[in-house]
Regions:
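Outer-membrane beta-barrel translocator domains and adjoining extracellular loop/strand segments
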Residues: 35-43, 78, 82-90, 129-136, ...
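Conserved C-terminal beta-signal and adjacent last beta-strands/turns
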Residues: 9, 95-196
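Outer-membrane beta-barrel signature, preferentially recognizing the C-terminal barrel domain
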Residues: 1-24, 29-32, 37-64, 96-102, ...
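Gram-negative outer-membrane beta-barrel transporters
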Residues: 24, 29, 48-132, 166, ...
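Short flexible/disordered coil segments
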Residues: 42-48, 60-62, 85, 91, ...
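Structured loop/turn residues at beta-strand edges in well-structured enzyme cores
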Residues: 19, 67, 154
């Protein structure tokens, strides 16, 4: 296969709302050629899609709101499509696979005192197409995550994380219309950090 080609144009701005809280904004357009995709007419075959673009806007916010409250979040709007018909399945005007129009995430950590902190986060992804033929749609989903932090002493911290708190069933990704991966069920892990 020929190598992929791309041209990216981007403009952005950053704002220090206060010394430890920053926001950023970026607008972009990415034009790509020779992009390898699975041919839905013959899933054992890879074809090159020569002509697609993505344009979008990204907003990010990260830092401390107060001494006890930290947050990190972002939102993205993306639009992308095939700009030239390549095959019976990769048709001009089709939306790109795996590209949600809207996605957002927000993570909050609040330190109750110097020993204990809690975290809560949300992840949202709008629906996406499994492939460039736009025949199979993976539905939108919203997932909640949580954490508890304990400072045992200045050098030792314990952390419990729970991902997919509500045990939401969702589809995370797809390699083709018939190779779709589910999102992970509720999972938890413990982490011990030692600083020396």
């Amino acid at each position: 296969l020929q190598p992929e080609r791309s041209v990216n144009r981007e403009i952005g701005a950053k704002w220090d709302i206060k010394p430890d809280l920053q926001a950023s904004l970026a607008l972009y357009r990415l034009d790509r050629g020779n992009v390898a995709v699975v041919d839905q007419a013959d899933v054992t075959r890879i074809i090159l899609v020569d002509g697609q673009y993505v344009r979008g806007i990204e907003l990010d916010l990260a830092g401390r709101v107060t001494d006890a409250w930290q947050l990190m979040g972002g939102y993205a709007y993306q639009a992308g499509e095939i700009t030239a018909t390549q095959s019976a399945t990769a048709i001009k005007g089709n939306r790109l696979a795996h590209l949600p129009k809207h996605s957002a995430s927000l993570w909050n950590r609040y330190d109750i005192n110097q020993t204990v902190g809690v975290g809560l986060g949300i992840v949202y992804r709008a629906s996406i197409f499994a492939n460039v033929d736009n025949l199979v749609t993976l539905p939108a989903f919203t997932r909640f995550d949580a954490a508890v932090y304990w400072t045992l002493n200045p050098a030792l911290q314990l952390q419990l994380n729970v991902e997919n708190l509500a045990n939401k069933h969702y589809f995370a990704s797809a390699n083709s219309n018939n190779n779709i991966s589910p999102g992970a069920p509720r999972s938890a892990w413990v982490k011990l950090n030692y600083h020396f």
